């Protein structure tokens, strides 16, 4: 019995090897990923069915309790019983692809066994679809893994050969011959089939683990390299930056050489051949030009593809990886090797992954840069906005003063020019020192005092050491203008406006107080949050909204405006970060 078991293992080993080789083909990955369709079932049923037919031909033939060994069984006589190994392949198909694939493979094997004939052809043909169907169902019931565990496979593999022996006992015309066959080959067949199924699942699981671990290591390697390259990608492009990048990649990838190019020229070359592969040279390789044009990775497997004019150049092969920015190829990373054998599937996958990650980072940085420019442009637009009514009223005031007080008109005109000049200047800056903001405000207040002499009193309280803190430009003047236009100018008593700038903990608090009419209570929750739908006389809240949006965008949510009414008028308050204000932009 031991000798028979060894013989059966030898025959089954060939089938296991063939089945394992099949699973390494990329098309068979759909079985492991459980992506089963009708087309998949038909295709793989034919493939596994072909292997199961081979399993039938390399089986053994029995006459009674006598075992006949043949290298390849061609036909089976009526007095002979075929004990094939097609059932092993059918069980493998069922475990990998489920009951339908197992059934399909079993039907192919069963139909072929009918043509082989023999005394037990009914049992032999029937066991194959039954084994495939039952193994597939059992595999789905007992395991949700991509590949069943070996222990479960061992358990499931016991039942199909037992069922096979039962069918032979029932369907063989001569019951005595059936008993002799089962006694002779029953136990060895159960042992070999179940262990074969176990060995196959172990082989698949080990191969998958190795592949996934290798992929994880290469992915981690690519991510690590990309992370180290990120600071260089943030810098302005140029030959110096390209050389830094080439040195980094050369160190991390452990290859013969590396070059970085733009669309037409070599920017940097590090490693072997740097004595004749010089920066500034035009792209020579046909494959490099093809990679730039088509945007797909190219591989030079032969030294002739590198097209180097130096006879003894040690660079034999290369991978050319296109780098994208916003969907357009901007250059290449060329990875050079000493031998073509070094360009493995792992190296190609790493090169592709590295190119994709670097391209995504470059595109992300470009998008972030454009977003920042758009944000800055929006801020400039908000900062440069001037209330047209203020200009019209000031021009009207100057026109009126020219008749009665030309000197005062000249003074107001000078203040207006300073105000306008400051307004244009701050449009180019994100943050300005507080003293410049106060100068801008003072120019505005000079004009206001001329318009409302002895009607409005303003005072500003600030410590000298706070004059250098930074503040978004055109913040105080619109707040003061809003207070005067919608509060103080409508008051019957003399208007008083006070600005207090004080340090509190790590912040600078700026508070504007006035004794005007205050804000409508229903508007307080939304002031500064969005523009209002008001008529021209009541205002639309654009000024407060613009200021609040700039404060939030530049300094964060903590610096937003807080607006409330007081017993004597209204109060507008916000804070500036004291220690970090110069590091915001």
Swiss-Prot record:
GO molecular function: ATP binding; phosphorelay sensor kinase activity
Membrane spanning residue stretches: 6-28, 41-63, 82-104, 111-133, 153-172, 179-201
Signal peptide positions (record): none
Membrane topology recorded in Swiss-Prot or TrEMBL: Multi-pass membrane protein
Keyword Coiled coil attributed: no
One GO cellular component term noted in the UniProt record for this chain: plasma membrane
Modified residues (Phosphohistidine): 389
Pfam families named among the record's database cross-references: 5TM-5TMR_LYT, HATPase_c, His_kinase
Catalysed reactions, semicolon-separated: ATP + protein L-histidine = ADP + protein N-phospho-L-histidine
GO biological process, any: cell wall organization
EC number(s) from the headed UniProt entry: 2.7.13.3
Alphabetically ordered keywords of this record: ATP-binding, Cell membrane, Kinase, Membrane, Nucleotide-binding, Phosphoprotein, Transferase, Transmembrane, Transmembrane helix, Two-component regulatory system
InterPro entries: Bact_2-comp_sensor_kinase (IPR050640), GAF-like_dom_sf (IPR029016), HATPase_C_sf (IPR036890), Sig_transdc_His_kin_internal (IPR010559), Sig_transdc_His_kinase_LytS_TM (IPR011620)
Location of the protein in the cell: Cell membrane
Function: Member of the two-component regulatory system LytS/LytT that probably regulates genes involved in cell wall metabolism.
PANTHER family reported in the protein's UniProt record: SENSOR HISTIDINE KINASE YPDA (PTHR34220:SF7)
Name this protein carries in UniProt: Sensor protein LytS
Native source species: Oceanobacillus iheyensis (strain DSM 14371 / CIP 107618 / JCM 11309 / KCTC 3954 / HTE831)
Lineage, broadest ranks: Bacteria, Bacillati, Bacillota, Bacilli, Bacillales
Gene name of the encoded protein: lytS
């Amino acid at each position: 019995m031991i000798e028979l078991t060894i013989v059966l293992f030898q025959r089954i080993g060939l089938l296991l090897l063939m089945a394992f080789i099949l699973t390494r083909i990329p098309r068979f990955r759909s079985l492991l990923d459980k992506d089963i369709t009708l087309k998949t079932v038909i295709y793989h049923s034919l493939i596994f069915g072909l292997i199961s037919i081979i399993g039938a031909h390399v089986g053994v033939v029995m006459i009674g309790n006598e075992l006949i060994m043949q290298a390849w069984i061609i036909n089976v006589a009526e007095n002979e019983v075929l004990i094939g190994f097609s059932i092993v392949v059918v069980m493998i198909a069922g475990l990998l692809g489920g009951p339908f694939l197992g059934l399909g493979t079993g039907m192919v094997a069963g139909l072929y066994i009918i043509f082989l004939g023999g005394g037990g052809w009914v049992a032999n043909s029937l066991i194959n679809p039954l084994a495939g169907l039952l193994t597939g169902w059992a595999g789905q019931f007992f395991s949700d893994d991509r590949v069943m565990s070996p222990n479960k496979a061992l358990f499931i593999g016991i039942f199909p050969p037992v069922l096979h022996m039962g069918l032979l006992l029932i369907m063989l015309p001569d019951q005595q011959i059936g008993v002799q066959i089962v006694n002779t080959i029953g136990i060895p067949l159960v042992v070999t089939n179940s262990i074969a199924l176990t060995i196959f699942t172990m082989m698949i699981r080990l191969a998958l683990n190795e592949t996934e671990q290798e992929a994880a290591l290469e992915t981690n390697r690519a991510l690590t390299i990309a992370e180290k390259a990120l600071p260089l990608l943030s810098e302005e492009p140029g030959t110096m930056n390209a050389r830094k990048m080439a040195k980094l990649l050369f160190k991390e990838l452990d290859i013969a050489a590396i070059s970085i190019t733009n669309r037409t020229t070599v920017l940097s070359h590090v490693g072997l051949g740097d004595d004749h592969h010089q920066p500034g040279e035009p792209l020579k390789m046909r494959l490099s030009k093809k990679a730039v044009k088509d945007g797909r990775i190219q591989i030079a497997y032969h030294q002739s593809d590198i097209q180097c004019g130096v006879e003894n150049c040690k660079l034999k092969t290369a991978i050319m990886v296109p780098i994208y920015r916003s969907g357009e190829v901007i250059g290449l990373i060329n990875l050079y090797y000493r031998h073509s054998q070094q360009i493995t599937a792992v190296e190609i996958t790493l090169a592709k992954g590295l190119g994709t990650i670097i391209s995504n980072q470059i595109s992300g940085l470009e998008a972030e840069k454009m977003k920042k420019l758009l944000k800055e442009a929006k801020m400039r637009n908000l900062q440069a906005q001037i209330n047209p009514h203020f200009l019209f009223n000031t021009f009207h005031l100057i026109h009126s003063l020219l008749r009665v007080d030309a000197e005062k008109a000249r003074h107001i005109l000078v203040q207006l020019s300073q105000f306008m000049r400051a307004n244009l200047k701050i449009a180019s800056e994100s943050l300005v020192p507080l003293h410049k903001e106060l100068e801008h405000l003072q120019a505005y207040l000079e004009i206001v005092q001329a318009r409302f002499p002895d009607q409005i009193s303003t005072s500003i309280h600030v410590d000298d050491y706070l004059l250098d803190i930074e503040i978004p430009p055109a913040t105080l003047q619109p707040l003061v203008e809003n207070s005067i236009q919608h509060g103080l100018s409508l008051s019957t008593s003399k208007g008083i406006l006070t600005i207090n700038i004080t340090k509190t903990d790590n912040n600078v608090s700026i508070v504007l107080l006035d004794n005007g009419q205050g804000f409508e209570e229903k508007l307080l929750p939304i002031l500064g949050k969005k523009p209002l739908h008001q008529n021209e006389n009541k205002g639309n809240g654009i000024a407060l909204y613009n200021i609040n949006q700039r404060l939030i965008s530049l300094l964060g949510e903590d610096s937003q405006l807080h607006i409330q009414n007081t017993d004597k008028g209204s109060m507008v308050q916000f804070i500036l970060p004291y220690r970090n204000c110069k590091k915001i932009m």
